């Protein structure tokens, strides 16, 4: 609905949410790896809708509507399917209009209702590489948990022995795949 009427740049994101067959870059995602895309996983496991995660304020919707009419929004390029994709936004940017902190996008009373300390305790069995312990400072949920592309274990940037959950990517692989997909899509246009 949203993509059909107004948000043409949402096609790539909707496809990753609805079927999980491709990520926002238009790259095929094997069935066994689809659960690593949190939008798809939440839709399949909990029936979460787009608006279940993206909770816009009225002022945000008006601003987006005006930007859409004026064509004043930033497109990063086209994906491999020729669909426009937007510049990546952080969780802090996605929650700014609500006056919420970035991790509140995920950790709130409607979704993952727990504190940072409770999350760290729940994953304590991961040992010294517990990604929720923030041994190196605070890391936003979205730095690892990706909604419309395969999730990435950020710890792997420095720790080569960091465990990769099923379907997840090491940071280097994720960066290379995204860059390769964008380059291929944009060279196809030329």
Question: Could you tell me what each predicted segment is?
Answer:
Residues 1-190:
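Short sequence/structural segments immediately N-terminal
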């Amino acid at each position: 609905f949203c993509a059909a009427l107004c948000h043409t740049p949402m096609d790539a994101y909707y496809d990753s949410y609805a079927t999980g067959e491709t990520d926002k870059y238009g790259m095929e995602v094997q069935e066994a790896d689809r659960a690593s895309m949190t939008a798809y996983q939440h839709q399949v496991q909990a029936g979460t809708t787009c608006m279940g995660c993206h909770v816009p304020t009225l002022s945000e919707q008006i601003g987006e509507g005006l930007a859409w009419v004026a064509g004043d929004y930033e497109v990063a390029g086209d994906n491999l399917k020729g669909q426009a994709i937007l510049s990546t936004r952080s969780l802090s940017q996605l929650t700014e209009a609500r006056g919420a902190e970035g991790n509140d996008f995920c950790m709130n009373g409607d979704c993952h209702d727990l504190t940072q300390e409770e999350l760290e305790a729940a994953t304590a069995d991961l040992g010294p590489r517990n990604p929720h312990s923030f041994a190196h400072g605070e890391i936003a949920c979205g730095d690892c948990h990706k909604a419309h592309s395969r999730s990435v274990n950020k710890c792997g940037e420095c720790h080569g022995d960091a465990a990769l959950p099923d379907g997840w990517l090491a940071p280097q692989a994720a960066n290379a795949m995204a860059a390769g997909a964008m380059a291929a899509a944009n060279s196809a246009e030329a």
